[in-house]
């Protein structure tokens, strides 16, 4: 059984591969600043995409997307603007996405992508 940190890292790696196979260009991972952390930053066409990755071993405590609260979404919006300013992307439209990664013991991972949160 993986630790929570190992599960999160595996989930982020699987999510990055998943998005790349769908044409996204990953430009940053685990970007941190005093306001928080962004799991994945990517481009989907013209959109600068901030992707929140939620990995779980099971649905016992609910679907991974249920862990994205209104407060988390507000923080992601703030982080998106901070990342764009820090990296000089002033004209790209910004979109917040989420990737749910379910990694049951002994089974293949299952991923879901939700575009354009709130």
Swiss-Prot record:
<dbReference type="GO" id="GO:0003676">
    <property type="term" value="F:nucleic acid binding"/>
</dbReference>
<protein>
    <recommendedName>
        <fullName>UPF0102 protein RSal33209_1090</fullName>
    </recommendedName>
</protein>
<dbReference type="Pfam" id="PF02021">
    <property type="entry name" value="UPF0102"/>
</dbReference>
<dbReference type="InterPro" id="IPR011856">
    <property type="entry name" value="tRNA_endonuc-like_dom_sf"/>
</dbReference>
<dbReference type="InterPro" id="IPR011335">
    <property type="entry name" value="Restrct_endonuc-II-like"/>
</dbReference>
<comment type="similarity">
    <text>Belongs to the UPF0102 family.</text>
</comment>
<dbReference type="InterPro" id="IPR003509">
    <property type="entry name" value="UPF0102_YraN-like"/>
</dbReference>
């Amino acid at each position: 059984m993986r630790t929570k940190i190992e599960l999160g890292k595996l989930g982020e790696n699987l999510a990055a591969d998943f998005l790349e196979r769908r044409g996204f260009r990953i430009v940053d991972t685990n970007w941190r600043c005093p306001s928080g952390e962004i799991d994945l930053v990517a481009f989907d066409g013209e959109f600068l995409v901030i992707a929140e990755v939620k990995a779980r071993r099971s649905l016992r405590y609910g679907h991974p997307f249920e862990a994205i609260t209104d407060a988390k979404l507000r923080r992601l919006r703030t982080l998106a603007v901070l990342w764009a300013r820090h990296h000089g992307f002033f004209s790209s439209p910004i979109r917040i996405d989420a990737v749910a990664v379910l990694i049951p013991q002994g089974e293949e991972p299952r991923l879901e992508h939700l575009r354009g949160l709130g």
